A protein has these predicted regions:
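Zinc-coordinating Cys/His ligand positions in small cysteine/histidine-rich zinc-finger domains
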Residues: 72-75
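Di-metal (Zn2+ and/or Mg2+/Mn2+) metal-binding site signature of metallo-dependent hydrolases
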Residues: 79
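Histidine-centered nuclease catalytic patch
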Residues: 35-69, 82-85
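A boundary/linker detector
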Residues: 1-47, 88, 93-101, 105-117
Length: 117
């Protein structure tokens, strides 16, 4: 006989929230302007997306939501707005032009920290 917990038929185990997941933080981040457009005086032409930083990361794991920064689609994926250098399309050119994506975390956290939910 095993010592497993007994669940009623059809009952689901309670869902666990993954560590590092903060939906309220990401919701606030989506309301912000692109940090790259803001820093470099560019016009934001596409919606803001949450970019989970990749520079300085040494695994395939996504960084926690608190390490995400607001980027327009053009600076992030570059699939719809091709007028900008997109991090996921041209990572070396993006890094040369704008620096490390991790450099924008502190400013993002400061702005979101001043918001009230």
């Amino acid at each position: 006989m095993t010592n497993r917990p007994i669940y009623q038929k059809g009952a689901k185990k309670p869902a666990k929230q993954s560590p590092g997941k903060e939906p309220a933080y990401l919701a606030a981040l989506h309301l912000m302007p692109c940090c790259i457009c803001q820093a470099f005086g560019e016009t934001q032409l596409s919606p803001t997306q949450a970019h989970h930083t990749i520079h300085g990361r040494y695994s395939t794991r996504k960084t926690p939501d608190r390490a995400a920064i607001p980027m327009c689609e053009g600076h992030h994926q570059g699939l719809m707005d091709t007028s900008k250098t997109a991090l996921h399309q041209q990572p070396d050119a993006w890094k040369a032009a704008y620096g490390l994506d991790t450099d924008y975390i502190a400013g993002t956290q400061e702005i979101i920290g001043n918001l009230t939910f």
